[in-house]
Structures are given as C-alpha cells and as structure tokens.
Design a protein with these regions (language model features):
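Conserved active-site segments centered on acidic
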Residues: 1-85, 164-174
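Phosphate-binding/catalytic loops
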Residues: 4, 87, 93, 97-177
C-alpha cells in the first residue's frame, strides 16, 4: 500500500479551529472513500495551549452538527511536520506566514502551505503574491456559541474543495509495485 497522503490543519493554539477542521476533513474523506489513503492531523503555531484538550465550545459545535468530538491534546507544529505533510492548511494569513518561516529554505514545504478557505468556492479569490487575510477563518476563541458555529460553517464550506484537491493529488501519484 502507498504511503498515506498527509493533511495538517494549523491555527494558533490547536484547540479550536484546527482540530475542528481536522474533524470535518476526516469526516469528508471517509464519506469520499479516502479514509484509508489520507491521514489528517492538526497543530498550532503557539505552544501556549500545548497539552490542552479541544476547547469545550468547539466540541459542542461539532457535536451539535453530528461530528464526533476527539479526545486529543494540543501540540505545536514542528519543522518536521511540514516536511512530512503533503498539504498544510492554514487558518489565517498570520498562520501561513509563520508556517512559511518555519519551513525556511525548504521550498517544497513552503509551497505546501495553503489557506484553508482558498478551497471554498464562495471565498474571495486571492492573486498569487497578494495578501491572504481575506481568507482568514474567523477566530471563535473570544466569542460565544454563535462564533463557533460561524467558524464551523467556514470550515465545512472549504472541505469539499480540499477533498477534490487531495483526490487529484492522489491520482497523480505514481503507482507502487
């Protein structure tokens, strides 16, 4: 069997947006019949929440829409994560910039960093080299339940586009004998 395609979602502390995106994407990959070929993980650019579980408000939002709530611990992204991933999905422009700095001189790793909302067909188009902030996934941390619902809606809106991209990437991988 071929190595799995690795998707990593990244936010600030790895307790709200990125684990929610991880859950949504795992669900969509399973529905698309790709669960055995794709591994989804999540991290944060900060170590401030390291070891903490998913924010309970994120868990409530996921459960309200029928998703399972993962038992997991937040962790900070490492350079090795960027090397191992096939696709790195940043929640904001600030996250994307931080990830590209972490990738450093590894041009391939830099190219694998993509804004998650760029896969949402209703999101604004951003020209190459232009500012990406218009694609930021709203941070629900300082808000209430409605803010987590908005965030989850943004994540779901991009998920099918991510699945299509991964499916296309998998089709281009050479067959192993």
């Amino acid at each position: 069997m071929a190595d799995p395609y690795r998707v990593m979602t990244v936010c600030t502390g790895n307790i709200c947006r990125s684990p929610m995106a991880e859950v949504v994407l795992r669900d969509r990959f399973e529905a698309a019949g790709l669960a055995g070929r794709v591994v989804v993980d999540s991290t944060g650019i900060s170590s401030e929440e390291h070891g903490n579980p998913i924010d309970p408000r994120a868990g409530f939002a996921l459960a309200a829409r029928g998703y399972g709530v993962p038992v997991r611990s937040a962790r900070r992204v490492r350079a090795g994560d960027l090397v191992a991933a096939d696709l790195v999905l940043a929640m904001t422009e600030v996250h994307a910039q931080a990830l590209r700095r972490i990738a450093g001189a590894d041009d391939a790793a830099v190219r694998r960093v993509v804004m998650l909302r760029s896969f949402d067909p209703a999101a604004p188009h951003v020209a190459p080299g232009a500012r990406e902030h218009v694609l930021d996934v709203d941070d629900p941390w300082y808000g209430g339940p409605d803010d987590f619902e908005v965030c989850l809606t943004q994540l779901e809106a991009a998920a099918d586009g991510v699945v299509a991209r991964v499916r296309a990437d998998l089709a281009e991988r050479p067959a192993r004998t």
